[in-house]
């Protein structure tokens, strides 16, 4: 009888722990961890109250404009870089992910490879830049940059070559992970 009671308690605890997932580092539709697409720049102090916020500002004729906001954990680990838009009520437009704990709902993050991206997400398009390849997803606001040095040598030079998903090696590492909110 005691065994059944202990078993029931342990099972209940396991179910409770399993259901209590931490979303502080999940990238979902209109959300990056604690940050929501609807948050304004003024909300940043509240959203990241337990973290360090560093604002990179520029002085203009009409006042001070925030160019970039860096978010650090209290221990000094760089989490995010936020770039606001220039609206009258500025919101976040671009987020650069620095911390590998941030992953998409399907588990793709900075420590993932191109194989992880193509296996877990639908690729919308691939844009070739001078030194990088940018991969946009259909099902997420996140996009990934892979350095051309990860590609075969015949694709590394020149930006006029359109690169397709089949040409990118499965083991290609992610250089940057970004989220774009327009």
Spans of features found by a protein language model:
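Positively charged
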Residues: 145-150
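Bacterial Sec-dependent N-terminal signal peptides
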Residues: 1-26
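Short, solvent-exposed loop/beta-turn-alpha elements that line the ligand-binding surface or hinge
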Residues: 153-157
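Short helix/turn-capping signatures at newly exposed starts of structured segments
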Residues: 19-130, 139-140, 158-182
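Mixed-charge (Asp/Glu-Lys/Arg
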Residues: 135
């Amino acid at each position: 009888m005691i065994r059944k009671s202990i078993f029931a308690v342990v099972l209940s605890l396991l179910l409770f722990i399993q259901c209590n997932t931490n979303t502080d580092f999940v990238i979902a539709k209109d959300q990056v961890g604690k940050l929501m697409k609807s948050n304004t720049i003024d909300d940043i102090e509240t959203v990241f109250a337990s973290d360090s916020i560093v604002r990179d500002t520029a002085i203009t004729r009409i006042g001070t404009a925030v160019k970039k906001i860096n978010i650090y954990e209290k221990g000094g680990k760089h989490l995010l870089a936020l770039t606001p838009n220039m609206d009258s009520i500025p919101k976040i437009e671009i987020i650069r992910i620095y911390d590998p704990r941030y992953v998409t709902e399907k588990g793709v993050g900075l420590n993932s490879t191109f194989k992880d991206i193509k296996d877990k997400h639908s690729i919308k398009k691939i844009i070739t830049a001078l030194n990088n390849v940018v991969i946009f997803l259909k099902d997420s606001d996140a996009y990934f940059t892979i350095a051309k040095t990860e590609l075969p040598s015949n694709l590394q030079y020149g930006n006029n070559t359109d690169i397709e998903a089949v040409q990118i090696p499965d083991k290609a590492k992610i250089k940057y992970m970004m989220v774009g909110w327009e």
